[in-house]
Amino acid sequence: MASKEVLEDTVEERVISEEYKIWKKNTPFLYDLVMTHALEWPSLTVQWLPDVSRPEGKDYALHWLVLGTHTSDEQNHLVVARVQIPNDDQFDTSQYDSEKGEFGGFGSVTGKIETEIKINHEGEVNRARYMPQNPYIIATKTPSADVLVFDYTKHPSKPDPSGECNPDLRLRGHQKEGYGLSWNSNLKGHLLSASDDHTVCLWDISAGPKEGKIVDAKAIFTGHSAVVEDVAWHLLHESLFGSVADDQKLMIWDTRSNTTSKPSHSVDAHTAEVNCLSFNPYSEFILATGSADKTVALWDLRNLKLKLHSFESHKDEIFQVHWSPHNETILASSGTDRRLNVWDLSKIGEEQSAEDAEDGPPELLFIHGGHTAKISDFSWNPNEPWVICSVSEDNIMQIWQMAENIYNDEEPDIAAAELEGQGT
């Protein structure tokens, strides 16, 4: 039995390796930017910070990322890293590095990704998210039940060698660990967290700690009957949020309700565990959920009884789903199949040739195939449209942007230019 499993693993490794070679060979045609960086330890979490700096006279901009570590028994850290991304006009396909499968003029740009701040953390960082109203404040999910809050301006850039973790706040309320974490973009300091203990906790950190650094949950929502995988505030309504769980349900909650045990809406969303959700930043009624049933579902809050659409192409569980911050119809999803799919809602139902249909449905805009292990998290860059950072379980972090001709299908207006000066 064991030898059969070993054989299967070897075959899978060979397939992954072959697929990666093909991907690497094709990157100049598929991307305007690819940076591959091996982290010292894998990160389970990634999020771009909102700041960008464009140094005068330089051919790049500086961006920042929040990462974490997942070590094998060594000290863990919350990490803020600085990234140099070349300006659009610097993307030069002739700079392609076939060995690394990288290009974008990066051979010449040294020190493109550097760790700026490392803060001691209790166990691995399951997830880290910054507070929109003050991006220096970062909340983290730990292997314990506590949620930690750090103001990274109050910590030295190099961690204390003792390994002591010294968060600015410790949020109590859960009995077990989890992953889901969401700051309210309309109410400063309001944080939601999802947990394996079947609950969602809400804290208001602006109220400050009662004693020491401990803040107790303001409310605990108990509607789910299994592990709650993810939670997200609505982006426009300050009192609405959604949660998804292993009970296969999507629940919509209103914090103004006088009950915390019953959601406003509960939907059987998928045929397996629901792992993630994301509200559309442009359309107040639209949200998406991702599931172990390998699909992403599209929902309208005005009629949750009816699933608007099911996106099908992933070969395994989906763990992340995020709408683009720049395009109302663009959505991306990733997970266990090592692929990050970018979808375009505006293409749903378009006619396809039989050949194109073999590659996936018309709404599947792009498949990022650069990872050779499960993707743990990804983040859309808020300042550079179409730039995504994705991290996988094998320590690899990739910062990439698909080729413009893939998402910009308008034909270049050559005819008009040719006609200029020809009279009418």
Curated annotation (Swiss-Prot):
Task: Write down any Gene Ontology CC term.
Answer: NuRD complex
Cellular location(s): Nucleus
Say where the protein is mainly found: nucleus
What Gene Ontology molecular function terms does this protein carry? histone binding; RNA binding
Q: Does the UniProt entry include the keyword Membrane?
A: no
Instruction: Please report the residue spans annotated as repeat (WD).
Output: 47-121, 127-172, 180-216, 227-268, 274-311, 317-368, 375-402
Keywords, in A-Z order: Chaperone, Chromatin regulator, DNA replication, Nucleus, Repeat, Repressor, Transcription, Transcription regulation, WD repeat
Q: What InterPro entries does UniProt report for this protein, alphabetically?
A: G-protein_beta_WD-40_rep (IPR020472), Histone-bd_RBBP4-like_N (IPR022052), WD40/YVTN_repeat-like_dom_sf (IPR015943), WD40_repeat_CS (IPR019775), WD40_repeat_dom_sf (IPR036322), WD40_rpt (IPR001680), WD_repeat_RBAP46/RBAP48/MSI1 (IPR050459)
What biological process terms from GO does the record include?
cellular heat acclimation; chromatin remodeling; DNA replication; negative regulation of cell growth; negative regulation of DNA-templated transcription; negative regulation of transcription by RNA polymerase II
Q: Where is this region: Interaction with HAT1?
A: 359-404
Q: Does the keyword Repeat apply?
A: yes
* Entry function: Core histone-binding subunit that may target chromatin remodeling factors, histone acetyltransferases and histone deacetylases to their histone substrates in a manner that is regulated by nucleosomal DNA. Component of several complexes which regulate chromatin metabolism.
Q: Matching PANTHER family, A to Z? A: WD40 REPEAT FAMILY
On assembly, the entry states: Binds directly to helix 1 of the histone fold of histone H4, a region that is not accessible when H4 is in chromatin. Also interacts with histone H2B and HAT1.
Family from the record = Belongs to the WD repeat RBAP46/RBAP48/MSI1 family.
Q: What is this protein called?
A: Histone-binding protein RBBP7
Naturally occurring in which organism (per UniProt)? Gallus gallus
Primary gene name: RBBP7
